[in-house]
Amino acid sequence: MGSGYAKKKKEAKLMERQFMEMEASLEQKRFSGEAGNGLVSVTINGKCNLVDVKIKPDCLDPEDPEVVADLFRAAFKAAKAALDSEMSAMHMGMPF
């Protein structure tokens, strides 16, 4: 086990550190999505945790409460797509 092993071990530690830094950076970022022309907006962080939800009163219909749920799901899906896009771009720069 010569210098090749030591070099690989050093590279692995560097990649691990870069990955942890990337993960910490991603957690601090915010990703937003909206639906219904902005009637519902959702913000998540890089760990996909819900940070904020905004619902405009215009979409609150007591006769059809499912509308809000549908808009929420669509807004969350848009925010998650933004997060996935960012993660994909970050992984493109990783050597593995």
Swiss-Prot record:
Subcellular location(s) per record: Cytoplasm, Nucleoid
Gene3D superfamilies recorded: Nucleoid-associated protein YbaB-like domain
GO molecular function: DNA binding
InterPro entries: YbaB-like_sf, YbaB/EbfC
Pfam families, alphabetized: YbaB_DNA_bd
GO cellular component, one term: bacterial nucleoid
Signal sequence residues: none
Alphabetical UniProt keywords: Cytoplasm, DNA-binding
Coiled coil regions in record: none
HAMAP family assigned: DNA_YbaB_EbfC (MF_00274)
Protein task: Binds to DNA and alters its conformation. May be involved in regulation of gene expression, nucleoid organization and DNA protection.
Protein family: Belongs to the YbaB/EbfC family.
NCBIfam families: DNA_YbaB_EbfC
Subunit-level organization: Homodimer.
Protein name per the record: Nucleoid-associated protein TC_0612
Organism of provenance: Chlamydia muridarum (strain MoPn / Nigg)
Taxon lineage: Bacteria, Pseudomonadati, Chlamydiota, Chlamydiia, Chlamydiales
